[in-house]
Amino acid sequence: MVSGPLALRWCAWAGRGDMGPDMELPSHSKQLLLQLNQQRTKGFLCDVIIMVENSIFRAHKNVLAASSIYFKSLVLHDNLINLDTDMVSSTVFQQILDFIYTGKLLPSDQPAEPNFSTLLTAASYLQLPELAALCRRKLKRAGKPFGSGRAGSTGMGRPPRSQRLSTASVIQARYQGLVDGRKGAHAPQELPQAKGSDDELFLGGSNQDSVQGLGRAVCPAGGEAGLGGCSSSTNGSSGGCEQELGLDLSKKSPPLPPATPGPHLTPDDAAQLSDSQHGSPPAASAPPVANSASYSELGGTPDEPMDLEGAEDNHLSLLEAPGGQPRKSLRHSTRKKEWGKKEPVAGSPFERREAGPKGPCPGEEGEGVGDRVPNGILASGAGPSGPYGEPPYPCKEEEENGKDASEDSAQSGSEGGSGHASAHYMYRQEGYETVSYGDNLYVCIPCAKGFPSSEQLNAHVETHTEEELFIKEEGAYETGSGGAEEEAEDLSAPSAAYTAEPRPFKCSVCEKTYKDPATLRQHEKTHWLTRPFPCNICGKMFTQRGTMTRHMRSHLGLKPFACDECGMRFTRQYRLTEHMRVHSGEKPYECQLCGGKFTQQRNLISHLRMHTSPS
């Protein structure tokens, strides 16, 4: 099945003589939409996740980008998108997603008037003009107001003139500030006027006093999306846009910024805007909504007409902005990494190490789930049980990963916070990004070095095992008839006394030494009392972004590394490398004492402990 921009162009050409030749099969576009919807319901080739309240929706980037300019600007930079719950709920977004993939408004349990009014608000927020026009026609046929009304009436009444003017001032001020604050920014195409259409200037809702969405349509990526723009993450003072493609959960939307009055507002308008913002009730948390059933399961056939009259052929034809040019994205240049710049608490380890090594610089930890991972909508009520305690419900992260020695040591250094992590088998990588080894398919697990052949890997592994044996022998000579507990401590102790490599970097808390500052910083995080990276799903706290990202993969079921032989998928690349040896029958790890061979390095390490144990 074709899934990509080319497929969407075929779909958009249905019945359009100006974009391409007439189709031989008039139902081709419907069949294509049917296949795409079935892929979505099964989670096949889905490369973006939309989170609304407590619900998770999987979709395809190209389908969303072809349906909405708003989504088109978001999916270029984000793979995990949070929508504003004041503007769209999970139930309404379920209907919108079904409409995008099927062209039909599926039946709902809600009455007609609130349903279409809420849909109109959400469609205007997400910039779906066809759906907004359809909702207006439905409301007009029912005789319900959607664009005008008294100031105090409920429903879809138009805001009073003072609110519309203040709204236009806020939008213009924010838009101008974004353009002026960005280096080399082009001139804006056109500023919105106070007399714009209903869905361009202000977003009507069931509660007319909710002006928070009127002054700004907040992009989940941290920018202002009311003009179809989205922010682009910048590092420090650089103004370049980071464009990350592929399913990478390292990019996470920051918290929604509060709306601040612009310079064009009068004091009365500013007070009115502030009161209306604080008076807007928060959206109720809806139960999780699973992905809808496929088009065929919902009773629709490929030959049924779509609800969108006159727009069936182009409801997915928004791949490009007017004029054939893609709209430019705007991002704040002030999105910086701030969690390392907090004021130190009196008596904390931060204050004790003021003269020592500084915290990690921005960018040294690799890509993360955000500059500062917020306690999002899913983290409310799901935090730890105590100030630094464990979450009230356990996570099942280790079900797929296993509880092997190598990964336990890596997790203990970043999550345990006890300072007794094994420094001998700790990962040396700063970020969570998996290294592309190329032809070096034979990977040493503790140090993550790749080798092109098993012979070179064996020679490298010998340096690890010989050093370990030497440590154990020295410990046995010093302790005489010491027990197994003392020898285990020798194994986990730093190997500075037995190696020729200098270790000039010393921990200011526990006096351990390391050979490079990056490893020292990673170790020092285990002494920190704060864990600034929470999981937005279960509330578990982490000291590193990379560890939290791997943890979130277990919640979302993301396994990006697939085996070409059997199709089995894994969350980590080294797991896939180990799995491939099952198909090849290769056992690259050999014991130098008895000649036994193993497919995994941790099995060899356990085997060596059997040789060196006193029993």
From Swiss-Prot:
Residues 144-167, 182-208, 229-421 are annotated as: Disordered. One of its GO terms (cellular component) is plasma membrane. GO terms for biological process: negative regulation of DNA-templated transcription; negative regulation of transcription by RNA polymerase II; regulation of cytokine production; regulation of immune system process. It is found in: Nucleus. The keyword tRNA processing does not apply. Its main location: nucleus. A zinc finger (C2H2-type) spans 442-469, 505-532, 533-560, 561-588, 589-615. It holds the Pfam family BTB. Residues 246-250 are annotated as: Binding to CtBP. Residues 280-296, 379-388 have a biased composition (Low complexity). The modification Phosphoserine is found at S166, S169, S197, S348, S412. One of its GO terms (molecular function) is zinc ion binding. Keywords: DNA-binding, Metal-binding, Nucleus, Phosphoprotein, Repeat, Repressor, Transcription, Transcription regulation, Zinc, Zinc-finger. Transcriptional repressor. Belongs to the krueppel C2H2-type zinc-finger protein family. Hic subfamily. This is Hypermethylated in cancer 2 protein. It comes from Homo sapiens (Human). The lineage of its organism: Eukaryota, Metazoa, Chordata, Craniata, Vertebrata. The gene is HIC2.
